[in-house]
Amino acid sequence: MNSIKFPILDRTTKNSVISTTLNDLSNWSRLSSLWPLLYGTSCCFIEFASLIGSRFDFDRYGLVPRSSPRQADLILTAGTVTMKMAPSLVRLYEQMPEPKYVIAMGACTITGGMFSTDSYSTVRGVDKLIPVDVYLPGCPPKPEAVIDAITKLRKKIAREIYKDRIRPQQGNRCFTTNHKFFVVRSPHIGNYDQELLYPPSSTSEISTETFFKYKSPVSSHELVN
Protein backbone atom coordinates (compact mmCIF):
# COMPACT_ATOMS: atom_id res chain seq x y z
CA MET A 1 0.00 0.00 0.00
CA ASN A 2 1.49 3.27 -1.09
CA SER A 3 1.52 6.03 1.49
CA ILE A 4 0.45 9.54 0.61
CA LYS A 5 3.37 11.88 0.37
CA PHE A 6 2.87 15.62 0.65
CA PRO A 7 5.21 17.81 -1.36
CA ILE A 8 7.62 19.90 0.62
CA LEU A 9 7.02 23.54 -0.29
CA ASP A 10 9.91 25.89 -0.39
CA ARG A 11 9.58 29.04 1.66
CA THR A 12 10.37 31.09 -1.42
CA THR A 13 7.49 29.65 -3.42
CA LYS A 14 5.37 32.43 -4.90
CA ASN A 15 2.15 30.41 -4.67
CA SER A 16 2.17 30.64 -0.89
CA VAL A 17 1.63 34.40 -0.97
CA ILE A 18 -1.92 35.77 -1.11
CA SER A 19 -2.24 39.29 -2.41
CA THR A 20 -5.46 41.24 -1.98
CA THR A 21 -6.76 44.64 -1.08
CA LEU A 22 -8.45 45.82 2.08
CA ASN A 23 -11.62 46.56 0.13
CA ASP A 24 -11.81 43.03 -1.32
CA LEU A 25 -11.17 41.52 2.09
CA SER A 26 -13.94 43.62 3.61
CA ASN A 27 -16.37 42.67 0.84
CA TRP A 28 -15.53 38.98 1.21
CA SER A 29 -16.12 39.03 4.96
CA ARG A 30 -19.46 40.86 4.61
CA LEU A 31 -20.90 38.71 1.83
CA SER A 32 -19.96 35.56 3.74
CA SER A 33 -21.74 36.58 6.94
CA LEU A 34 -24.96 38.41 6.12
CA TRP A 35 -27.20 38.75 9.16
CA PRO A 36 -30.78 39.39 7.98
CA LEU A 37 -33.63 41.04 9.82
CA LEU A 38 -36.85 39.34 8.71
CA TYR A 39 -39.62 41.93 8.34
CA GLY A 40 -42.84 40.22 7.31
CA THR A 41 -46.38 41.61 7.39
CA SER A 42 -48.26 39.18 5.14
CA CYS A 43 -48.34 35.77 3.48
CA CYS A 44 -44.99 35.99 1.64
CA PHE A 45 -43.25 35.76 4.99
CA ILE A 46 -44.30 32.09 5.29
CA GLU A 47 -41.71 31.16 2.64
CA PHE A 48 -38.96 31.86 5.16
CA ALA A 49 -40.04 28.73 7.05
CA SER A 50 -38.95 26.66 4.04
CA LEU A 51 -35.64 28.49 3.80
CA ILE A 52 -34.74 27.83 7.41
CA GLY A 53 -35.53 24.12 7.01
CA SER A 54 -33.04 21.42 6.08
CA ARG A 55 -34.14 21.18 2.44
CA PHE A 56 -32.85 24.61 1.42
CA ASP A 57 -30.74 25.48 4.49
CA PHE A 58 -29.88 29.12 3.86
CA ASP A 59 -27.43 28.95 6.78
CA ARG A 60 -24.86 27.67 4.30
CA TYR A 61 -24.59 31.22 2.95
CA GLY A 62 -23.69 32.51 6.39
CA LEU A 63 -27.14 33.99 7.02
CA VAL A 64 -28.00 34.18 10.70
CA PRO A 65 -31.45 35.71 11.39
CA ARG A 66 -31.37 38.47 13.97
CA SER A 67 -34.19 39.98 16.00
CA SER A 68 -32.52 43.35 16.55
CA PRO A 69 -31.83 45.85 13.74
CA ARG A 70 -28.62 46.95 15.47
CA GLN A 71 -27.15 43.49 14.85
CA ALA A 72 -28.36 43.10 11.25
CA ASP A 73 -26.94 44.32 7.96
CA LEU A 74 -29.72 42.99 5.68
CA ILE A 75 -33.47 43.47 5.94
CA LEU A 76 -35.88 41.32 3.94
CA THR A 77 -39.28 42.96 3.58
CA ALA A 78 -42.22 40.71 2.73
CA GLY A 79 -45.90 41.56 2.62
CA THR A 80 -48.00 44.68 2.34
CA VAL A 81 -46.62 47.86 3.91
CA THR A 82 -49.37 50.14 5.21
CA MET A 83 -49.19 53.78 6.20
CA LYS A 84 -49.30 52.79 9.86
CA MET A 85 -46.36 50.37 9.49
CA ALA A 86 -44.25 52.71 7.34
CA PRO A 87 -42.74 54.71 10.25
CA SER A 88 -41.68 51.53 12.06
CA LEU A 89 -40.04 50.16 8.90
CA VAL A 90 -38.09 53.38 8.35
CA ARG A 91 -37.02 53.38 11.99
CA LEU A 92 -35.78 49.79 11.78
CA TYR A 93 -33.80 50.63 8.66
CA GLU A 94 -32.22 53.70 10.24
CA GLN A 95 -31.19 51.68 13.31
CA MET A 96 -29.20 49.22 11.19
CA PRO A 97 -25.44 49.88 11.03
CA GLU A 98 -23.72 50.76 7.76
CA PRO A 99 -23.32 49.18 5.29
CA LYS A 100 -26.85 47.81 5.08
CA TYR A 101 -28.89 46.20 2.33
CA VAL A 102 -32.56 45.66 1.48
CA ILE A 103 -34.30 42.87 -0.43
CA ALA A 104 -37.93 43.57 -1.40
CA MET A 105 -39.75 40.23 -1.55
CA GLY A 106 -43.15 39.82 -3.18
CA ALA A 107 -45.49 41.87 -5.35
CA CYS A 108 -47.17 43.58 -2.39
CA THR A 109 -43.85 44.91 -1.13
CA ILE A 110 -42.61 46.07 -4.54
CA THR A 111 -45.75 47.72 -5.97
CA GLY A 112 -48.45 47.40 -3.33
CA GLY A 113 -49.99 44.42 -5.11
CA MET A 114 -53.72 43.97 -5.31
CA PHE A 115 -54.20 46.24 -2.30
CA SER A 116 -52.84 49.32 -4.09
CA THR A 117 -55.85 49.76 -6.40
CA ASP A 118 -58.54 51.05 -4.06
CA SER A 119 -56.80 51.12 -0.69
CA TYR A 120 -56.06 54.50 0.86
CA SER A 121 -53.62 53.11 3.44
CA THR A 122 -51.23 51.02 1.30
CA VAL A 123 -47.75 52.21 0.35
CA ARG A 124 -47.21 51.78 -3.41
CA GLY A 125 -43.78 50.18 -3.11
CA VAL A 126 -41.34 49.94 -0.24
CA ASP A 127 -38.73 51.82 -2.29
CA LYS A 128 -40.69 54.99 -1.56
CA LEU A 129 -39.56 54.63 2.06
CA ILE A 130 -36.13 52.94 1.99
CA PRO A 131 -33.63 52.20 -0.83
CA VAL A 132 -33.91 48.69 -2.26
CA ASP A 133 -30.92 46.70 -3.56
CA VAL A 134 -32.64 43.60 -4.97
CA TYR A 135 -36.25 43.26 -6.17
CA LEU A 136 -37.80 39.80 -5.90
CA PRO A 137 -41.24 39.63 -7.61
CA GLY A 138 -43.72 36.86 -7.05
CA CYS A 139 -46.90 36.04 -5.15
CA PRO A 140 -45.28 34.49 -3.24
CA PRO A 141 -41.71 33.93 -4.50
CA LYS A 142 -40.40 30.40 -4.26
CA PRO A 143 -37.57 29.57 -1.83
CA GLU A 144 -35.29 28.99 -4.82
CA ALA A 145 -36.00 32.56 -5.97
CA VAL A 146 -35.09 33.92 -2.53
CA ILE A 147 -31.78 32.06 -2.64
CA ASP A 148 -31.15 33.47 -6.12
CA ALA A 149 -31.82 37.00 -4.83
CA ILE A 150 -29.34 36.45 -2.00
CA THR A 151 -26.77 35.20 -4.52
CA LYS A 152 -27.23 38.33 -6.64
CA LEU A 153 -26.83 40.48 -3.54
CA ARG A 154 -23.59 38.67 -2.68
CA LYS A 155 -22.26 39.38 -6.17
CA LYS A 156 -23.21 43.03 -5.79
CA ILE A 157 -21.38 43.25 -2.46
CA ALA A 158 -18.27 41.69 -3.99
CA ARG A 159 -18.06 44.44 -6.64
CA GLU A 160 -18.82 47.51 -4.56
CA ILE A 161 -16.49 50.00 -2.93
CA TYR A 162 -16.89 50.44 0.81
CA LYS A 163 -16.55 54.22 0.83
CA ASP A 164 -19.29 54.62 -1.76
CA ARG A 165 -21.59 52.34 0.20
CA ILE A 166 -21.40 54.15 3.53
CA ARG A 167 -22.00 57.51 1.86
CA PRO A 168 -25.20 59.12 3.19
CA GLN A 169 -28.23 58.15 1.12
CA GLN A 170 -30.76 60.59 2.53
CA GLY A 171 -30.98 62.44 -0.79
CA ASN A 172 -31.99 59.26 -2.65
CA ARG A 173 -35.02 58.55 -0.48
CA CYS A 174 -38.43 59.46 -1.80
CA PHE A 175 -41.68 59.22 0.06
CA THR A 176 -45.08 58.09 -1.07
CA THR A 177 -47.59 60.55 -2.48
CA ASN A 178 -49.53 62.42 0.17
CA HIS A 179 -53.12 61.28 0.43
CA LYS A 180 -55.74 64.03 0.26
CA PHE A 181 -58.47 63.84 2.85
CA PHE A 182 -61.62 65.96 2.77
CA VAL A 183 -63.45 66.86 5.97
CA VAL A 184 -67.14 65.99 5.73
CA ARG A 185 -69.97 66.28 8.23
CA SER A 186 -70.38 63.14 10.26
CA PRO A 187 -73.77 61.48 9.77
CA HIS A 188 -73.86 60.30 13.40
CA ILE A 189 -74.36 63.63 15.18
CA GLY A 190 -77.94 63.17 16.43
CA ASN A 191 -79.59 65.29 13.74
CA TYR A 192 -81.93 62.77 12.17
CA ASP A 193 -83.68 63.25 8.88
CA GLN A 194 -87.10 64.70 9.64
CA GLU A 195 -88.58 63.29 6.44
CA LEU A 196 -88.04 59.74 7.68
CA LEU A 197 -89.82 60.37 11.00
CA TYR A 198 -92.72 62.54 9.87
CA PRO A 199 -94.68 61.83 6.66
CA PRO A 200 -95.36 64.65 4.20
CA SER A 201 -98.54 66.71 4.60
CA SER A 202 -100.07 65.20 1.44
CA THR A 203 -100.41 61.77 3.08
CA SER A 204 -103.98 61.14 4.31
CA GLU A 205 -104.45 60.34 7.98
CA ILE A 206 -106.19 57.15 9.12
CA SER A 207 -108.67 57.51 11.93
CA THR A 208 -108.69 55.16 14.90
CA GLU A 209 -112.25 54.01 14.22
CA THR A 210 -111.36 53.03 10.66
CA PHE A 211 -108.29 51.14 11.84
CA PHE A 212 -110.01 49.02 14.49
CA LYS A 213 -113.27 48.24 12.67
CA TYR A 214 -111.50 45.64 10.50
CA LYS A 215 -111.04 42.35 12.35
CA SER A 216 -109.39 40.59 9.41
CA PRO A 217 -106.17 41.69 7.68
CA VAL A 218 -106.80 44.25 4.98
CA SER A 219 -104.65 45.99 2.42
CA SER A 220 -103.30 49.47 2.84
CA HIS A 221 -105.36 50.60 -0.17
CA GLU A 222 -108.59 49.78 1.64
CA LEU A 223 -107.50 51.62 4.76
CA VAL A 224 -106.67 54.77 2.86
CA ASN A 225 -109.92 54.74 0.90
Swiss-Prot record:
* Membrane-topology annotation of the record: Peripheral membrane protein
Q: Which residues form a coiled coil?
A: none
Which GO cellular component terms, listed alphabetically, does the Swiss-Prot or TrEMBL entry include?
A: chloroplast; chloroplast thylakoid membrane; plastid
Keywords of this entry: 4Fe-4S, Chloroplast, Iron, Iron-sulfur, Membrane, Metal-binding, NAD, NADP, Plastid, Plastoquinone, Quinone, Thylakoid, Translocase, Transport
* Note on cofactor: Binds 1 [4Fe-4S] cluster.
Q: Which GO terms describe its biological process?
A: photosynthesis, light reaction
For this UniProt entry, what is the primary localization, expressed as one broad class? plastid
Positions annotated to bind [4Fe-4S] cluster: C43, C44, C108, C139
The protein's location, in the record's own words, is: Plastid, Chloroplast thylakoid membrane
GO molecular function (one): 4 iron, 4 sulfur cluster binding
Necessary cofactors: [4Fe-4S] cluster
Q: Which InterPro entries match?
A: NADH_UbQ_OxRdtase-like_20kDa, NADH_UQ_OxRdtase_20Kd_su
What reaction gets catalysed by this protein?
Answer: a plastoquinone + NADH + (n+1) H(+)(in) = a plastoquinol + NAD(+) + n H(+)(out); a plastoquinone + NADPH + (n+1) H(+)(in) = a plastoquinol + NADP(+) + n H(+)(out)
Q: Which top class of enzyme applies to this chain?
A: translocase
Q: Which PROSITE patterns match?
A: COMPLEX1_20K
UniProt-listed Enzyme Commission number(s): 7.1.1.-
Q: Which family does it belong to?
A: Belongs to the complex I 20 kDa subunit family.
Subunit = NDH is composed of at least 16 different subunits, 5 of which are encoded in the nucleus.
PANTHER family under this entry? NADH DEHYDROGENASE, NADH DEHYDROGENASE [UBIQUINONE] IRON-SULFUR PROTEIN 7, MITOCHONDRIAL
Instruction: Kindly provide the name given to this protein in its UniProt entry.
Output: NAD(P)H-quinone oxidoreductase subunit K, chloroplastic
Species the sequence originates in: Arabidopsis thaliana
